A protein has these predicted regions:
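Sec-dependent bacterial lipoprotein signal peptides
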Residues: 1-21
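Bacterial lipoprotein signal-peptidase II cleavage site
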Residues: 19-36
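Extracytoplasmic low-complexity, Pro/Thr/Ser/Ala/Gly-rich segments
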Residues: 32-79, 93
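Extracytoplasmic substrate-binding proteins
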Residues: 56, 150-223
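Structural recognition of the beta-strand scaffold that forms the well-ordered cores
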Residues: 67-69, 87-90, 136-139, 156-159, ...
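A short, structured surface patch at a secondary-structure boundary
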Residues: 68-69, 74-128, 159
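Stable alpha-helical elements in mature extracytoplasmic
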Residues: 73-76, 82, 125, 141, ...
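Short helices/loops that flank or line small-molecule/ion binding pockets
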Residues: 122-134, 151-152
Length: 223
């Protein structure tokens, strides 16, 4: 199962149309003068718990080696300046909707061998994932063996729109995008960065009507 196209379109359109410079590199990070461990723990929000479909995942530190199935959550990771956490990707990625910088980063991520699914998407064996020392897979249940990975200590995070147990989404409410940003920010210990991004995204969508041109215009499209 792949990300619901309406939600993917909203997220990708916003990711391509905005650039938050320096959101992942603070003055402290550049200078090496970081906060105390207690302060860092508090600001990171750990331990953080998020739902991955029906499974509750708890993170005590940021994932270091991430596998992406196709480009699941790639726009969100890009906007949060977290693509450097992705060690491998599997499946095809259509980079035509991304800005040049993000597309270049995605293409540079090493590709892991997978099997194309008849319903779309890609499947990767547990052995391949463990051999690559992956600690988090961002994707969908059809692509991996969730239970086998859990036994090996590897988490599978699936966005809400990828879950079979969720009520089908017929209308892509913008709240789904900001909710996903919040969840990914929690997983990687950057809740403040996620909050800042959500504020910017909400402002951007609120400003859309101001930029609409033409007599009788009553709608603006994000995708």
């Amino acid at each position: 199962m792949k990300l619901h196209p309406l939600i993917a379109g909203l997220t990708l359109a916003l990711a391509s149309s905005m650039c938050l410079t320096g959101c992942g590199t603070s003055h402290q990070e550049k200078s090496g003068a970081g906060p105390s461990s207690a302060t860092a723990s508090a600001s990171s929000g750990y331990p953080a718990t998020v739902m991955s479909c029906a499974e509750k995942l708890t993170f005590t530190e940021a994932p270091k080696r991430v596998l992406l199935l196709e480009d699941t959550d790639a726009p969100t990771l890009s906007m949060l300046d977290l693509l450097d956490k992705v060690s491998a990707r599997a499946g095809k990625i259509d980079t035509s909707g991304y800005d040049v910088n993000t597309a270049t980063k995605l293409k540079a991520i090493p590709q892991m061998k997978g099997t194309s699914l008849a319903t779309g998407g890609v499947s990767v064996s547990t052995e391949s994932i463990l051999d690559a020392h992956i600690d988090l897979v961002i994707g969908y249940d059809l692509g991996v063996d969730r239970k086998a990975l859990a036994k090996a200590g590897v988490k599978l995070y699936s966005p809400d729109a990828n879950c079979d147990d969720q009520t089908p989404v017929n209308h892509a409410d913008f709240g789904l995008v900001t909710k996903e940003v919040t969840k990914v920010g929690a997983i990687f210990g950057v809740p403040e960065r996620a909050a800042t991004l959500n504020k910017a995204l909400k402002k951007q969508t609120a400003d859309l009507p101001k930029h609409a041109a033409g007599k009788g215009v009553s709608a603006a499209a994000l995708w």
